[in-house]
């Protein structure tokens, strides 16, 4: 028996079947950074049209988590796809470096500023800590395969950023948006000063818990708001009840709050023969009645909280009325569902009060004693006044219940004494005094929001948001570099010049320069006596929110407004909002053209990842086990606009999808063995018909994939890529061409036509994959034949995919033939199970069908057998089902399968009547003889 193996074109490639990504990727990364790949990309795209995706800064604290990975991978996919579209698309990564979390971490190590270390030393420790965190996160981001200017990131603690943030503040002042107001802060009456969050400790404290009745002014109006069960309005005064553990704040009460969507009940109560009506959260009626000791009561009707808005109630012991307002912080967790609101003594009360322009009453002095003009309680310390207030409530018939509770309460870390919330002067960006609210709403309309619901979400927030308090009493932050009049609080008339001078100092030496500054240096001796240096710092949301000015507008390689902001959906209230506010305030336009949001990662039960639940999957573990490309493929294969479910099983499924794509790519490469694109290409119109079809399909697919990338639909990209690899390409085309690839003459038209198709597909597919599976795409790129740039990332989408113009068969024709093939395969498999045949090549398939389908099948001639992977196919035109045939899913198609009587060719394994006809080759068929010793077979169709 002769060995014909050496006459076959067996597939061969150095591209391995196994990715071994966890081991291979770090080596590739090392080479990329040694080669300055990012710099090469920038050079290759210099002068091209720009696409700027501005990176929202993650907080420089702790390891990156899966949410960080999702965010950075999505950005990287978009930037790489834009680069392949021949845009110059730099990505400048950023970090948010100021604020409380870093201060808390540093405090654990060195203590609180002003105690064991000076404020200056504390800031240096914060800077060093943030720098270390940035470096740690940077390593992980790079490991993800994210391309960015990692050597020159923007940090909000960089001196130039801090200086530019101060300059933006100056421009906001210049445009008339800044004003000074009051806001409640933690206040220690023993220190006589405000406390930062970090200076607050929580300890158990016993407090009086009281239920207080407020009587409605317009009794008929409030009752008419209710949907009364039987039309009965009830009798007695109508009031509502609040529950509080801080009676001392009642002198500052300026409203009672309900929740717009909660249901409230109008309850008829009889107490010792007296009738009254009370409005309470319907879920809390039973608990409240038990607490009040009322046994006889019934509900008259119900209403949503929104219907009570703006009704007036009488203050329980002062001679004025306060409104009913709606507020988001109202719950039915405890109390009555109605909340006492004192804007001068609570953060949530303050925010709610801004919307209704409530007075921020603060009758309490710095020492915790009521001011002299405080009616009834002047001169009393607030905590000692609780008992007095309870007595006054009793006298006015307003006290419904009184008992003591022990609860967690904020205390001063120095004095270990209870603290209060007290309104103090703060700096605000006004939403209305210079039309910022309306201008922002107009710009929201001019921005494309993806998904579309983002527009209404942020618009509703802007419509309802209060003025933005931008001042913080922190140590580690950008200073509000202003000089304020010691008597009036007004800022210096030369503020614009002074801000620039302060910015220059900070640009040279960092924020410590402001704290070290002697005011007389900039103001002169006389003004320094009248004006004091503001010690407040800027809200960290201001820091990140001005990155459009400090980074996009400031760096030479970037231009604003940015084309895209991409962050989690929580950033409508956060970075998207602060960026919009500051940009509109100083520039009159939005800082972005498009805003895209992604959802959060949850486990298979829909729960957020948390250490306490033990359901955290770290990106580092996924990369170390499976590789970054698996993580990247998972991100791209998920509907990222909603919650993204993760589990080990889901990542393993992602690995399975990856293997299918890798194996398909390997098959393409292996069958390009010996192919030189310069000399061996066949023009598309000269190709075998099946090759024309697959190239045309790939060309159409590329159009669809590029459109999906342009609309940020990565899930659609991966679906189309997977469907191609498992369907038309993998299950059909690559299956059919094996015979031609392996057995045809190596340099024959039949084989070169096929190799040309494979080459075009491999060139295109590698680029389709590159934004998502970057490591694998580069690995394929290096294994492709022909001359090319060193990196797929410096190239553009493949332009060699040209649809043929002279195809004998349309795409619909081939899809119909493919459907017939599926039916043939189904019956071949049944014949194998019944042992009618062994391999499918042992079968003769007889097809009986109508005229139209028969004509298409017969047009393929003898090559139809290659499509069905059988040794013989007979097509007969019929009008009805012949005997001994089986019906199919295709109307009018009938099939029978029989074993062939022909002999098996030892080279191609087909069964043929002409095996052994050539004496020199007694074991092979005539086709193989031609391919071994002759001119080689001709293929026209398959």
Swiss-Prot record:
Query: What keywords is this UniProt entry annotated with?
Result: Aminoacyl-tRNA synthetase, ATP-binding, Cytoplasm, Ligase, Metal-binding, Nucleotide-binding, Protein biosynthesis, Zinc
Origin superkingdom: Bacteria
Set out the biological process GO terms recorded for this chain's protein: isoleucyl-tRNA aminoacylation
The UniProt note on the cofactor reads as follows: Binds 1 zinc ion per subunit.
> Where found?
Cytoplasm
Q: List ligand-binding residues for ATP.
A: 611
Which Pfam family is one of those matched by this entry?
Anticodon_1
Gene3D superfamilies linked = 1.10.730.20, HUPs (3.40.50.620), Valyl/Leucyl/Isoleucyl-tRNA synthetase, editing domain (3.90.740.10)
- Cited SUPFAM superfamilies: Anticodon-binding domain of a subclass of class I aminoacyl-tRNA synthetases, Nucleotidylyl transferase, ValRS/IleRS/LeuRS editing domain
Q: Which reaction does it catalyse?
A: tRNA(Ile) + L-isoleucine + ATP = L-isoleucyl-tRNA(Ile) + AMP + diphosphate
Q: What class of enzyme is it?
A: ligase
- Residues binding Zn(2+) are 905, 908, 925, 928
* Molecular function in Gene Ontology: aminoacyl-tRNA deacylase activity; ATP binding; isoleucine-tRNA ligase activity; tRNA binding; zinc ion binding
InterPro entries with a match to the protein in the record: aa-tRNA-synth_I_CS (IPR001412), aa-tRNA-synth_Ia (IPR002300), Anticodon_Ile_BEm (IPR033708), Ile-tRNA-ligase (IPR002301), Ile-tRNA-ligase_type1 (IPR023585), Ile-tRNA_ligase (IPR050081), M/V/L/I-tRNA-synth_anticd-bd (IPR013155), Rossmann-like_a/b/a_fold (IPR014729)
Where is L-isoleucyl-5'-AMP bound in this sequence?
567
Q: Which cofactor(s) does the record list?
A: Zn(2+)
**Motif 'KMSKS' region located where?**
608-612
NCBIfam families documented for this protein: ileS (TIGR00392)
How it assembles, according to the record, is: Monomer.
Q: Which family does it belong to?
A: Belongs to the class-I aminoacyl-tRNA synthetase family. IleS type 1 subfamily.
| UniProt-listed PANTHER family | ISOLEUCINE--TRNA LIGASE, MITOCHONDRIAL, SOLEUCYL-TRNA SYNTHETASE
Q: What information about domains appears in the record's comments? A: IleRS has two distinct active sites: one for aminoacylation and one for editing. The misactivated valine is translocated from the active site to the editing site, which sterically excludes the correctly activated isoleucine. The single editing site contains two valyl binding pockets, one specific for each substrate (Val-AMP or Val-tRNA(Ile)).
Protein name, as recorded:
Isoleucine--tRNA ligase
Gene expressing this chain = ileS
